[in-house]
Amino acid sequence: MNNINNIITRFLKNQWKEWRISILFLAFFVIPMKSSLADWNWVPTGSMNPTIVEGDLVYVNKLAYDLRFPLTLHSLKHWSDPERGDISVLFSPEDDARLVKRVIGLPGDRIEMKNNVLFINGQRLEYSELSETNIKDLMSDLRHHSIFAEENLDGRKHAVMSTPSIPTNKRSFGNVTVPEGHYFVMGDNRDNSKDSRYFGFVERKLFIGKATNVIVSFNKLDKYQPRFGRFFTSLN
């Protein structure tokens, strides 16, 4: 038994000597950097279709709003807050799941929706026709059975979609006021997104950062074929 223990001990010592620099680099640089400065996020669902599609790897700027102590929600330096139209990465107030959603309502805003048309502070948002180039990466079934539009959110235009065949009671809701220190977020795929219509307002401290770019993208339904046209593209 002692021989076995000695062999294991020597093996572990040799492995430590060989890998210690890499392990220390990972522990003291890579992990803190991903936690506080910049990160990437694989998107597994279609809640942000057509802006973000399943299989996108998005870049997350964790310095967009503040600098945080690594691996915590504690803010070391605050310099801005989420703005209307931001695509933000945040923790769900419901179960701490990591989500990618669009900021719709700011503190004090009055939000209302009538048949998938948004009203903010009593003003109806402007909607216009969406170019087909914005939906070319969606599944064929969605392209042919969904309704698409370009939504103007305080001058920030972005794509939204709805699918009439999806049963939901969230296409309309009454006037709600966003509390101080909280935000109202939604997915661009309005009929297939679990967002503030389900889990309520999101506290400011739960925002992780801003998703700004697609790094790479792979089609999970087609043997993970790369979508080269989405590589290194900006998110609106």
What function would you assign to each model-found segment?
Residues 2-15, 36, 41-42, 50-236:
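Soluble "head" domains of membrane/secretory-pathway proteins
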Residues 20-36:
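Hydrophobic membrane-insertion alpha-helices, especially the h-region
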